[in-house]
Amino acid sequence: MKAILYFILIPALLPVFIILRYVYLLDKKEREPLGFVLKVVLWGAIFSIPCAGVERFMLSFLSGFYDPASIEFAWMENTIGVALVEELSKWLVFMLLVWKNKNFDYRYDGIVYAVSASLGFAALENILYVISYGTGVSIGRAIFAIPGHATFGVFMGYWLSRAKTFWLDDKKIRMRICKLFALGVPMLIHGFYDFLLSDQVAALDLRSVFFIYVILLDFFAWRVIKHEFRTDRML
């Protein structure tokens, strides 16, 4: 039983650990309390649990307005029915646990905590995939799905750090705009990512577009991380 558990957990969680460790250790100025980071990871996983039910409801709702075989349905399904639900769950974890926490006091912290929430979500999702489809899926998910969730978290954290700066400066309108961007930007890039993998788009043979998109996403996420940890300062 123990061997089976390890056989499932190691391939499912190893890429999560590697990415989280990398992002965490880049925080040179004031490293975040590891216990609190892991708490955010845990709640990211917990908040992912109701997402499947909400997504099923959203897809049923959207099918009343769009032909399920259409490109329009694929776009709405993946942006509103999936990406919005999943990114909102991560955004809520951040707002409930991190936003007013005293440890969220440097700009790079936003990325650390948003990526932590995203990887918590990805961790449980990955465990369920490995249980359902076997360890064979873990390689593809380690290359694409888990780094994808981390990338969405990078952009969320970037905008939430900007929102916190405006909140502290009592610039409430700018704060709200940045909070909206913190949800909207990850939702759109996540939605387009899933859209390119949908059956409707697969019929158009646009796999090369997907790979180019992933490379560009990873490149820009790395540039954001690099900029944020090099210019890190107190909020």
Predicted regions and their residues:
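Hydrophobic alpha-helical segments at protein termini of multi-pass membrane proteins
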Residues: M1-L235
